[in-house]
């Protein structure tokens, strides 16, 4: 049985949705940027790829992975689209790893892309409302009337606020975590830590100037506790509500992908192994407790990998809201210095379907800089889920 290993990892820089550098870049372009680049960096022949597995939450044009493969001249390579909301690209990597472990395929590319800027709106007709319809964002559809807690499915409630209430996290603590996130992300950018993992993407500005977009644009060096404290809460009608735009993740655009092969294939072809995929896991929780999905899945994935918290060198716990990593640190007694070492969702942003692969990519490059070790990427996922992946460099 082959061990799944990663032989290439790449991402685009993360753009701010709607008015950022990637606002007019189609989803397909994000995919056709990271796919050929990760194949090239891995030293693979495009025709050797057995399958492309991409996550994209709201792509309206069918199988994005296959479209990307064809557009990149890989017509003999099939593709499959997956969707596990925020954890989609973690699932893509896990599915590819499972195929390798089962000796079904030898070479795969897995990842995810997200362009919330260009996401198509969809029309929604409420039951028994007659012909009247309204436009809504497809990544946050209205709750099904039979879903428990349907009126409270807003992510700032189910991920941010309910987690903060359950664990007893104050707004001051969440704001402090968000500030830390921006500071760490800005420090990483200024130190050039992301240069190796980012593939520049040519974009055309509104004034016609073409530039290479290669620096994450969401982190803000001018973030302060005072500015965060001055932001209004998102639901003032809820007593004690403490979630703001500042201690939440951004709305963003990006793409990320990794190339996976079996360890035997890597040895035979002389490929450089960047990381081994040790384990992966997913959990379900009540939709009202979505934020706790990231907390619960950590215990499950560590058990599968046969590891203890102290065995992990670095953690990437997605900051969909600041309350999530804080809750995980409390639950497992983590060393916070090892958590979100270069920022996360509050600062870098959260390009939903790309975030998992982005986290894996950043983990790999940082662990390599530090001489290796075990890394864990974990995140909650919309609808009441959590996903996680364990790597060893």
Regions found by a protein language model. Give the residues of each.
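Condensing-enzyme catalytic core mediating Claisen C-C bond formation in acyl metabolism
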Residues: 1-27, 165, 224-292, 296-299, ...
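N-terminal extracellular/periplasmic Venus flytrap/periplasmic-binding protein-like
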Residues: 11-12, 24-28, 41, 173-268, ...
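Conserved beta-ketoacyl condensing-enzyme motif
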Residues: 22-107, 111-129, 198-213, 288, ...
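Short, well-ordered amphipathic alpha-helical segments that serve as non-catalytic structural scaffolds
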Residues: 27-42, 64, 68, 92, ...
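Phosphate/pyrophosphate-binding loops at sites that engage ATP/ADP/AMP, CoA/4′-phosphopantetheine
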Residues: 36-48, 163-168, 266-273, 299-314, ...
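Conserved catalytic cysteine-centered active-site region
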Residues: 55-107, 150-156, 222-250, 331-358, ...
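Flexible glycine-/small-residue-enriched beta->alpha junction loops
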Residues: 107-162
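Active-site pocket-lining segment
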Residues: 159-161, 197, 205, 278-347
């Amino acid at each position: 049985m082959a061990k799944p290993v990663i032989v290439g990892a790449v991402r685009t820089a993360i753009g701010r949705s709607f008015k950022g550098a990637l606002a007019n870049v189609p989803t397909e372009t994000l995919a056709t940027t990271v796919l050929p680049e990760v194949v090239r960096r891995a030293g693979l022949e495009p025709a050797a790829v057995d399958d492309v597995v991409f996550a994209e939450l709201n792509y309206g044009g069918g199988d994005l992975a296959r479209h990307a493969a064809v557009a990149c001249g890989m017509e003999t390579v099939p593709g499959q689209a997956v969707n596990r909301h925020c954890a989609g690209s973690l699932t893509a990597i896990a599915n590819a790893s499972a195929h390798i472990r089962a000796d079904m395929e030898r070479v795969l590319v897995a990842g995810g892309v997200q362009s919330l800027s260009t996401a198509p709106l969809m029309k929604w007709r409420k039951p028994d409302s007659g012909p009247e319809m309204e436009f809504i964002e497809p990544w946050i559809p209205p709750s099904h009337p039979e879903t428990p807690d349907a009126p409270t499915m807003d992510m700032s409630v189910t991920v941010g606020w309910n987690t903060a209430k359950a664990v007893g996290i104050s707004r001051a603590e969440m704001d402090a975590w968000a500030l830390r996130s921006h500071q760490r992300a800005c420090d990483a950018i200024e130190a050039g830590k992301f240069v190796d993992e980012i593939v520049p993407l040519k974009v055309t500005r509104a004034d016609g100037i073409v530039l290479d977009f290669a620096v994450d644009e969401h982190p803000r060096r001018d973030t302060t506790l005072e500015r965060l404290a001055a932001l209004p809460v998102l639901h003032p009608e809820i007593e004690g509500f403490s979630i703001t735009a500042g201690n939440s993740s951004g709305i963003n655009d990006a793409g990320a992908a990794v190339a996976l092969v079996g360890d035997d294939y890597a040895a035979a072809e002389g490929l450089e192994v960047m990381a081994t995929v040790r384990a992966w896991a997913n959990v379900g929780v009540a939709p009202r407790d979505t934020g706790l999905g990231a907390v619960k899945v950590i215990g499950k994935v560590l058990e599968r990998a046969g590891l203890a918290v102290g065995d992990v060198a670095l953690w990437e716990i997605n900051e969909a809201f600041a309350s999530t990593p804080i809750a995980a640190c409390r639950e497992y007694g983590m060393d916070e210095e090892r958590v979100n070492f270069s920022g996360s969702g509050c600062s870098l942003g959260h390009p939903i379907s790309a975030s998992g692969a982005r986290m894996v990519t950043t983990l790999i490059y940082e662990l390599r800089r530090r001489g290796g070790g075990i890394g864990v990427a974990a995140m909650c996922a919309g609808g009441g889920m959590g996903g996680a992946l364990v790597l060893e460099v």
